[in-house]
């Protein structure tokens, strides 16, 4: 009964079709869409809408009525249900997308039921009669490009999502030409696997890659290439994809790697331009994916609708009756009941030839695209640029690369360049009232001024961007990912880095540096020790204690020698003239240079004072002369050194060099956690630095600091128990800032420079380098350093390298001299008292007085100068003046001089 009813319905539909000209006014078409194809669905809807609403004066219009299903390709039962649902609705053709899991199910149903499938998905490897491939094959174009580049050794990365057609073609060509191809399937790779693979290939010096993957996987691979820094100059990537402009390649632009690919859609054609105008007006909420330009798969989807519409027009012109398709049919019938007009539909589809968004759309008898043209693009500094095209007839044709470097520069001048830097005094700092400013005006510092000068010389606009992680740039040993400002350049987030960024080998491998704008080295910062207090006898410091001991021995020795030569020389002996009324000269001629007088003479000469006696003999005068010469040199040297020692404050530093740090354990030391200083110690082969690195790496708690400011703060708080290793420029700057409690010790451990960095191969590199050289020749770099280091210093002049400061003398500097003066005066008073007592005792015996009486008489005489009670003047027996006279006799060969002494 059901069969009879179905036949009646079909018969009625046939008569209705004949009455309406054998062609329905509404054509049922199907649509099968898989996950992540929102933009393709938008293009599908837009194409149908434009067809149904566009006037056509030459032919009677007909509407396309879509029946759309979203399929989950992982579930073959769901795919079958979706197709059967389309078939049961009486669709004349199906537009659908598939992947490797659903392709065989869909193509099998199409072949069995004679329902044509128009698809923008990857071409199938076998021959499917009722499948029309909108996507052209890349095999011929890719092989032509490999021949052009003359690659004979490269890596081929692929997945199985699109089959093995390109892999087979490349391996066949490799066998014919002797190519060495490393084919690697990356279907099951994750991010870590990608990075490990890329590092391994880099160790094998693999620099050329062909990547044949769908857009989602392709984009992930490119991100991992950037993350390990393989997107720089020296690498070449060919992307086996028809949407070169659909791929995000901004970071590769800055990296400098050569990237080549294919572009199916020419956005300069009138048809594409017109559609783009309409595309931009779509409501993004109603048409998801319309916020971005249509991908090549969306363009193929649009062309697929045009192909179906043109096919129905052709069928109507041929008066082929397709109205008997109806809305009945069981796709699971056994045996299968194919659609009777399916052959006519499939034949007419393959005969269609139109101009679509992807150029000429034409098929061979296998349903594959023929007579198509695809453009060849390369990535330039200004973005993707067409360098040629490929088609079946002409093969690869390269066109002249008209744009020049000047145009690249002009393009740079017309946009704002991102300048990455780091908050580090005095290079980049916030102004005190930075909240009142916007953009670059919020910052000040050496690098801010330098960026302004470089921009003036190059003629660019720029925007300062502070690096988010606050690091200079180092590569993680495990993930191989660069951080800091180097990472900003490597991964295309910035175009210039103007900061205290040290030029190193590992950085130079992934970015370009200008000539150094500042020279420096690694130095040691410690907390400034307390000023050493001068000792009581600091006046002795100008001469070593050994010298003082030698002077004492010399003094004694000279006195003894003078005594001896005076004893042996006859010219030192003389007689004294007797006073009137006295007896003649004594039998013992006097000699003035006894041991005490010799000591007194030597002391007077040393103190550069005089003496009331002088040598008479030649030998004595020789001794006196050499002693005077000796004292002249010693006193002059002492005086010269004394001025410096008493007027200069000295600070005793516990550390003076890296060797001092390495051989002690009391003072900890460390570096910045991510930077060239840490890398210097890690890579150093010098024994001292290796020992220091071993300590720093294993020290607990960690001696590495996140920022320079943190390291300086740690030095200040450690009470002299932490030393920070950093660039000398920062060390000198910090020494000039309050609270003025840090200092640089020792010399620089190495010699290096700061440079302005640009991405590898960037067109800005040469211009920046020339600007730095020009600024250096003009002396502006030195002016900037003086401005931010010393002119704005807060600790006074004197230079960062000086540890001594000249100051006025304090009492502590000369206290010892006063002590000696007071001690000498006290000693003199004591000796005078002893002499007073001794003489009083002698006078008491001589005058037959008591000791107390003699003492009183002596005291009265000392105080008042008056006579005593007995009328006699009590005076001490002072030596009388010596008067020389004539020799009156000779005894034992000695000339005796008359004297007045008894």
UniProtKB/Swiss-Prot annotation:
Q: How does it sit in the membrane?
A: Multi-pass membrane protein
GO MF term (any one): identical protein binding
Q: Which residues are glycosylated?
A: 52, 56, 258, 371, 407, 414
Intramembrane portions: 593-608, 609-611
Fetch the SUPFAM superfamilies from UniProt: Periplasmic binding protein-like I (SSF53822), Periplasmic binding protein-like II (SSF53850), Voltage-gated potassium channels (SSF81324)
Modified positions (Phosphoserine) in chain numbering:
862
Q: Membrane-crossing residues?
A: 545-565, 618-638, 814-834
Q: In which tissues is it expressed?
A: Detected in cerebellum.
UniProt cross-references to InterPro entries, sorted A to Z: ANF_lig-bd_rcpt (IPR001828), Glu/Gly-bd (IPR019594), Iono_Glu_rcpt_met (IPR001508), Ionotropic_Glu_rcpt (IPR015683), Iontro_rcpt_C (IPR001320), Peripla_BP_I (IPR028082)
Check the record and name the Gene3D superfamilies matching this protein: 1.10.287.70, 3.40.50.2300, Periplasmic binding protein-like II
Q: Which reaction does it catalyse?
A: Ca(2+)(in) = Ca(2+)(out); Na(+)(in) = Na(+)(out); Mg(2+)(in) = Mg(2+)(out)
Positions in the Extracellular compartment? 22-544, 639-813
Disulfide-bonded cysteine pairs: these are: 84-331, 740-795
Q: Could you tell me the keywords of this UniProt record?
A: Cell membrane, Cell projection, Disulfide bond, Glycoprotein, Ion channel, Ion transport, Ligand-gated ion channel, Lipoprotein, Membrane, Palmitate, Phosphoprotein, Postsynaptic cell membrane, Receptor, Signal, Synapse, Transmembrane, Transmembrane helix, Transport
Q: Where does L-glutamate bind?
A: 500, 502, 507, 676-677, 727
| Residue spans, topological domain Cytoplasmic | 566-592, 612-617, 835-902
Which SMART domains does the record associate with it? Lig_chan-Glu_bd, PBPe
Q: Which GO terms describe its biological process?
A: chemical synaptic transmission; modulation of chemical synaptic transmission; negative regulation of smooth muscle cell apoptotic process; positive regulation of synaptic transmission, glutamatergic; regulation of synapse structure or activity; response to fungicide; synaptic transmission, glutamatergic
Q: Indicate where a lipid (S-palmitoyl cysteine) is covalently linked.
A: 611, 837
Kindly state one GO CC term assigned in the UniProt record: terminal bouton
What does the UniProt PTM comment say about this protein? Palmitoylated. Depalmitoylated upon L-glutamate stimulation. ZDHHC3/GODZ specifically palmitoylates Cys-611, which leads to Golgi retention and decreased cell surface expression. In contrast, Cys-837 palmitoylation does not affect cell surface expression but regulates stimulation-dependent endocytosis.
Domain-related comment: The M4 transmembrane segment mediates tetramerization and is required for cell surface expression.
The annotated subunit structure for this chain is: Homotetramer or heterotetramer of pore-forming glutamate receptor subunits. Tetramers may be formed by the dimerization of dimers. Interacts with EPB41L1 via its C-terminus. Isoform 3 interacts with PICK1. Found in a complex with GRIA1, GRIA2, GRIA3, CNIH2, CNIH3, CACNG2, CACNG3, CACNG4, CACNG5, CACNG7 and CACNG8. Interacts with CACNG5 and PRKCG. Found in a complex with GRIA1, GRIA2, GRIA3, DLG4, CACNG8 and CNIH2.
Function summary: Ionotropic glutamate receptor that functions as a ligand-gated cation channel, gated by L-glutamate and glutamatergic agonists such as alpha-amino-3-hydroxy-5-methyl-4-isoxazolepropionic acid (AMPA), quisqualic acid, and kainic acid. L-glutamate acts as an excitatory neurotransmitter at many synapses in the central nervous system and plays an important role in fast excitatory synaptic transmission.
Misc remark: The postsynaptic actions of L-glutamate are mediated by a variety of receptors that are named according to their selective agonists. This receptor binds AMPA (quisqualate) > L-glutamate > kainate.
Put simply, this protein is called Glutamate receptor 4
